[in-house]
UniProtKB/Swiss-Prot annotation:
Annotated positions binding [4Fe-4S] cluster 2: C187, C243, C395, C399
Known role: Component of the cytosolic iron-sulfur (Fe/S) protein assembly machinery. Required for maturation of extramitochondrial Fe/S proteins.
Pfam families: Fe_hyd_lg_C (PF02906)
Species this chain originates from: Drosophila simulans (Fruit fly)
Name of the protein: Probable cytosolic Fe-S cluster assembly factor GD17698
Organism lineage: Eukaryota, Metazoa, Ecdysozoa, Arthropoda, Hexapoda
UniProt-listed GO biological process terms: iron-sulfur cluster assembly
Secretion signal, residue range per the UniProt entry: none
Length: 477
């Protein structure tokens, strides 16, 4: 199974990176010099064959995600390349070591284990095990607690804050007429593609607001750490996400705190990896104890544990920001549900606000890399300037159909599965981001809304990764 989105895959990659040596950590092959030269062949059994030297068994290349991010050539895909520190095996290793340290009362090496659940994996696992969404969240808490987790949280508060920051960023850009079209930034597959393929041309248009995963990292490693009086470096923060590209995002150097000597997110596992863990345990999710998700942020718990944000399936950015901008820029209070018009396909839709016959707001949703490529080309030809904001997601249908969501059963089409997950999502209660908790977090921990501190911890930067033009990156659509 592919571990990263289609846009970040290198085609025809093998466990053993060949002597073309595109990777920055190549296999080192020592061989004697020959005046006559030699023929080289990588065989199917992983041997490096040279006609004069016989066969040499190659070692596997151990490449970390940070190596990939530092490389200007490719983003390596897949289980063939060993992704260290970002796997269910690493999580189990940490949990087992932590249990041993607790048993031996080695308190200096005991870590607080925090698990954060995104909404889409909860829906995927609820459908897989045929249980209600709220019960799926409770059973997941029971499962992770059985492994030794200390806290199991949802991303709700981070989702709320991401919308608050992104909508204000858009209004500021619109009023200043600066760097429009604004492009969403919560999808790491899209962001990495933008950095490596289009660089400084496209990056000024990308929203600087951190994704909910990385905002959650700040909340856990700073606010929760203060509340429970544990240093950030002693907290092991795991997120459960709908796509493998979130592993890349968590590994960015921008999200490593030198002050805390800690990453905001230490490990990312995915819906399908949780399913694999449950399968290996030979115990379905429904057989684990039911515990409400933890809510360490305030004394008042929300009525529900799993929430939707607007109608769209990837965080609700386009819909929420459109309504906010209509009200705060044009004094239009849009109380009815928004209807996006389908254009070329169901993954490219737009919505328009008109005043006095003139278009004043024009938003779009672009899912899937075919639409993203068309989007970028239009921007390059200056034909996209009439869009003010575009919600961009690498996966067709958005995060609900993330690359690491549980796959359809035999005989089931992916669209049928996606439709069922969409139904589950649309039946969730809607969160209103501007609430008492987000106000509390801004006022008590971030020095208020739109302050230097809030900008520092809730926004990020992007980097133009200069590619070697001799390297051909073949993207499969």
């Amino acid at each position: 199974m592919s571990r990263l989105s289609t846009a970040l895959q290198l085609t025809d990659i093998d466990d053993f990176i060949t002597p073309s040596q595109i990777c920055i950590k190549p296999v080192q092959i020592d061989k004697a010099r020959s005046k006559t030269g030699a023929k080289i062949k990588i065989k199917g059994d992983s041997c490096f064959e040279e006609s004069e030297s016989g066969n040499l068994k190659l070692n596997k290349v151990d490449i970390s995600l940070q190596d990939c991010l530092a490389c200007s050539g490719c983003i390596t895909s897949a289980e063939e390349v060993l992704i260290t520190q970002q796997s269910q095996e690493e999580l189990l290793k940490v949990l087992q070591e932590n249990s041993k340290n607790k048993a031996s009362e080695d308190w200096d090496n005991v870590r607080t284990i925090v698990i954060t659940l995104a909404t889409q994996p909860i829906l995927s696992l609820a459908h897989r095990y045929q249980i209600g969404v709220e019960d799926a969240a409770r059973h997941l808490n029971g499962y992770f607690r059985s492994l030794g987790a200390d806290y199991v949280l949802s991303t709700k508060v981070a989702d709320d804050i991401a919308l608050l920051e992104c909508r204000q960023e858009f209004v500021d850009r619109y009023r200043e007429n600066e760097n429009l079209t604004m492009l969403s930034s919560s999808c790491p597959g899209w962001v990495c593609y933008a950095e490596k393929t289009h660089g400084n041309f496209i990056l000024p248009y990308v929203s600087t607001t951190r994704s909910p995963q990385q905002i959650m990292g700040v909340l856990v490693k700073q606010i929760l750490a203060d509340k429970i009086n544990v240093p950030a470096s002693r907290i092991y923060h795991v997120t459960v996400m709908p796509c493998y590209d979130k592993k890349l995002e968590a590994s960015r150097e921008d999200f490593f705190s030198k002050a805390n000597n800690s990453r905001d997110v230490d490990c990312v596992i995915t819906s399908v990896e949780v399913e694999q863990l449950l399968s290996e345990a030979q115990r379905p999710l429904s057989q684990y104890d039911l515990f409400d998700l933890d809510w360490p942020w305030s004394n008042v718990r929300p009525e529900f544990m799993v929430w939707a944000h607007e109608k769209t399936l990837s965080g609700g950015y386009a819909e929420h920001i459109f309504k906010f901008a209509a009200k705060h820029i044009f004094n239009e209070d849009l109380t009815t549900e928004l209807e996006f018009k389908q254009l070329r396909n169901r993954d490219f839709r737009e919505i328009i606000l008109k005043q006095n016959g003139k278009t004043v707001l024009k938003f779009a949703i672009a899912n899937g890399f075919r639409n993203i490529q068309n989007l970028v080309q239009k921007l390059k030809r200056e034909k996209l300037s009439n869009y003010h904001f575009v919600e961009v997601m690498a996966c067709p249908s958005g995060c609900i159909n993330g690359g690491a969501q549980i796959r359809p059963t035999t005989g089931q089409h992916v669209r049928e599965l996606t439709r069922k997950l969409e139904e589950l999502y649309h039946n969730l209660p809607r969160s209103e981001p501007e609430n008492s908790l987000t106000k509390h977090i801004y006022n008590d921990f971030l020095d208020g809304f739109q302050t230097d501190k809030s900008y520092e911890v809730l926004h990020t930067r992007y980097h133009d990764v200069v590619s070697d033009l001799s390297i051909s990156l073949n993207i499969n659509w």
